[in-house]
Amino acid sequence: MDVTPIRPSQFITRTGPGALTPTVEGSMLIPQLSTLVQELMNSGTKASVNFSEPDSFGKTGLQKFEINDSRMERMLRHFNSKPGKSFEKNIKMFRLPTNADLRIKEIDPILKGFIFPRWGLCTQHKGYGLVMQFSQKSNFEIILDCPKCRDQNIVPIRGSPIRFVQACTNGHLQDLYWPYLVHSGGNNCTSKLFEWRDIGGDNFIIKCTKCREQIDYLGSNGLKIRSINGRLKCQGNFPEINIQAYAQGSCSQVIIPGTGMMGSRAKLVMLNSTGLHTPKNLTSVQIPSISGPLYRELFPHRAVLKSILLLKHDLDKITLLDHLKQLGTEFTNDTINEIERTPENELLSLVNDIVSELTTNNKNNKTLSESQSNDEELTSLLEAARTGYPPSAKIGKKHAYVNIEDIIKIPSPEFGVTFRISPIKELRVIKTQVGYSREIGTTDDALDSTNSRVGTIKKESNHYDDDTTRWYLGDENIGEGIFIDIIESEINNPGGLNPIGSSSSNNIDTWNSINSTLDDILTNSVDYDEVKKDELKQEITHSNPTFVWWHTLCHKLLLNLTVDSGISLVSFGERVYCKKNTRTGKYQSGILIYSSATGSDGTLGGLVSLVEEQFMTKLFKTCSQGIVSCSNDPVCSERKIELTKIEGACCHACELLSETTCSYQNRCLDRNLVQDTMP
């Protein structure tokens, strides 16, 4: 196959193991992470050789591309732990190596995928196409060996893949096996060559070239009605784990809506359906306490620095340099030169900070759930908004990432609150893909209000295990952000610190009812494991009216900011925080809007430069107008929420964003709720 470029960030947020990716020649299934890593290690290609050879620090293989983040490692440990038993192996992350990292040409492949689906369509014959299996030389190399092309002395072409596959909410994926579907009436025909004839509209017919049995798409016994009524047999396949396995497993059945009968979970799905593969990502956003090129060079060797400090209590710059030079390949000449140029007091302070950070992380090695991580992020952001970050006593000659003098307050009579806006000059964003689900069909799973996903999260394909360590694929970016929260206001309104305040409406009552129902489910959830309980805790947070208020406002801010910041909408990220203070019983909340990019320079300040009083005042006024009206009203405004559909008044004309921008799958949005709180 020809090479198809994929960015590392795209691999994490949009594709990953188990995903079908469009290529120049058709469709490719990305294998499990273990297969990808083994290919990098053992394929014998130039990329594989360069991947395995030691770098200037003596590191080889995955260690060369390791991402260090203690918070994410704690989250991954929680994700892998079982009730009462913590995960025992080490957990580490690595980034996807690029062609430049492996010193190969941009057109040379690094990773290989499987051809999927394995049925193709030859389109070289007038009036109809021919459906047949690809002739597979290996898992990664195929041809469409059309017998009719051979008979007519026509050179066979690659053809195109069949545009449908079969998938289910348990994560299974398989080809539509045409011999079974066409000959399902008991016909003993063994032919595997079929005609594809379009007969108008969306309908088409698949007909056996030998016995002339056929099946259509829209008929009373067609593919579509079979899919709706649960009559497509699921064989329980995970082709990203074993592409050769076919019809070897089984899958549980469900009650089919409308019929009340038990049936298959399998559904007919288009290749390009976004719900066919929905990644499960963990995200950690932090304001670095220390940063800079020298920090990034020294941080991976923090254990070495700790040993030097233990040996030399009265450490000076000359002694430190002598010890580092004795380590040979551990440190590059560029690092040594940077150390020599750095003033001694700044250098020793940096080394002490790095070692102190290591000691703190080693002591704080408890598992961390997603909801706990979000609460930690909110606490640190609120503290930064109050005192700046790092606090003034620690800044020295370093620049502050949150400068207290840059924070502004914007009274908003439109929303009835006073916003505090804190520009954050540098953020570190870590994303790790830990699984995926297949969000397809409408089964009884869709009625499960305790989960934002219809499909079951499958995590077996998304890690690689060696003897001592479980590795996950991650992505590390540097960026900037704007944190927005609410402060005490003199505006005469029902808001205050809580944007909902004393407001009351049917919409707010409905959201409160949903929130209370989910809370009751959590209280009685004795059979749930820790990961499932954490997912339910997040659903409770996301259905809180305060969260919905902030999330709806955040989307409107993003849609307006993209016009003025020069940053495309898909490059933005969002974090919505809502945490109940156990001491006071009140809610702390806010939003973080950020943009990040690979490399030490991040996004160069285009976002934080917009934090200016006149601009932000106008921005909130514009957003309030967009909250009140939508070009799709009254259709949009009449959408009402319920327990099984917790999306209120929102549509693509006013609120919905791309999947890569919204961290919450465009759920828990409601313009009506925000309107009910406006003066």
Mark where each language-model region is:
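Elongated scaffolding segments in large macromolecular assemblies
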Residues: 186, 597, 606-679
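N-terminal alpha-helical interaction blocks
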Residues: 1-144, 148-158, 164, 174, ...
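Conserved structured core elements
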Residues: 116-119, 140-143, 158-162, 202-205, ...
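Generic amphipathic alpha-helical segments used as scaffolds and interaction surfaces in large
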Residues: 109-116, 155, 471, 537-552, ...
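Cys/His-rich short segments
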Residues: 101-245, 249-251
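Short loop/turn segments at secondary-structure transitions that flank enzyme active sites
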Residues: 170-174, 182, 214, 488-492, ...
